[in-house]
Amino acid sequence: MLHDRPPALDHWLYASRSTIEPAWAARSVDLLAIQSASRNAGLGLTGALLFTGQCFVQALEGPPAALDAMRTEISRDRRHTGVVTLAEGPLAHRRFGDWSLAYSGNSIYLAEQVHRAIARGDGAPALMGLLQAFAIPDGGARRTEMPQDT
């Protein structure tokens, strides 16, 4: 008798420096979030994106092949540089279940938290907690599209 197993899931948490002209950053990143949410939904990826005005922090999770393809695409994107993997590996269950991309833009508080966590060198758990906090109801994230059916 075969048991139904949940599909394999991997996750990737990274940080990078923005190369977007500051005058255009808010609009550019809003459009990026909308486009990414749609693409992520089609690939079965979920996650969250934080933008401080100077850097990005993003957590993505989903099927390993889809996540690998997205990692390659993100690593080649000219809107940022210095992509640093903070955490990666298999997941037992999704942390951002119905968010193809939860997104929160620039704020002083957010920028301070992100920069402090990156500077420590061991800030991956703190950053993951921050991303998850934004993805809970009334946590501050904006939906960039309708939630996926799960």
Enumerate the predicted regions with their spans.
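Charge-rich, low-complexity N-terminal segments
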Residues: M1-T150
